[in-house]
Amino acid sequence: MIKKRKKKSYTEVYALGQYISMSAHKARRVIDQIRGRSYEEALMILELMPYRGCYPIFKLVYSAAANASHNKGFKETNLVISKAEVNQGNTVKKLKPRARGRSYPIKRSTCHITIVLEDISFYQQNEEYLMYLKKPGCSNENRNLTCYDTYSSGGLWDKK
């Protein structure tokens, strides 16, 4: 079995909720509305949406932001939901007794929700630095930010 190694990102924080008693389809309907939005905007959307699945997702987003501020020292105003995914969990199966000795199955579906928050202040600082380097007052030694094309180095790969 091949395992993918995740790079440890210094700008990402996540929260994982497992075995939440909700259908994965219903959770995805809510998650699609907040993916890519800022932390504060996502909280406002989740508070105003009339779905039952909003509350556990609200708690997860809030928990991820608490992880960001406590563990990494990020400010909540700079957080953006970079990744939000819903996976299907186990299905709890029960039998409900009915008339004449019969029984009907009840399926209770669960889901696993992952929320990843990213700090965008790191990228804003890099943009400011690049804008500083592009100013005409900077020397040419610091402005060399070219990336050499590794595939056109000659040899076998240039031929068709």
UniProtKB/Swiss-Prot annotation:
Gene Ontology BP annotations: translation
Oligomer status and interactors: Part of the 50S ribosomal subunit.
Keyword match Cell inner membrane: no
Entry's Gene Ontology cellular component terms: chloroplast; large ribosomal subunit
Protein location: Plastid, Chloroplast
SUPFAM superfamilies: Ribosomal protein L22 (SSF54843)
Molecular function GO labels: rRNA binding; structural constituent of ribosome
PROSITE patterns registered for this protein in UniProt: RIBOSOMAL_L22 (PS00464)
A Pfam family reported for this protein in Swiss-Prot or TrEMBL: Ribosomal_L22
InterPro entries in the cross-refs: Ribosomal_uL22, Ribosomal_uL22_bac/chlpt-type, Ribosomal_uL22_bac/org-type, Ribosomal_uL22_CS, Ribosomal_uL22_sf
Annotated keywords: Chloroplast, Plastid, Ribonucleoprotein, Ribosomal protein, RNA-binding, rRNA-binding
Keyword Ribonucleoprotein on entry: yes
Main subcellular localisation: plastid
Family from the record: Belongs to the universal ribosomal protein uL22 family.
Protein name: Large ribosomal subunit protein uL22c
Matching HAMAP family: Ribosomal_uL22_B
Function: This protein binds specifically to 23S rRNA.
NCBIfam families recorded: rplV_bact (TIGR01044)
Taxonomy of the source species: Eukaryota, Viridiplantae, Streptophyta, Embryophyta, Tracheophyta
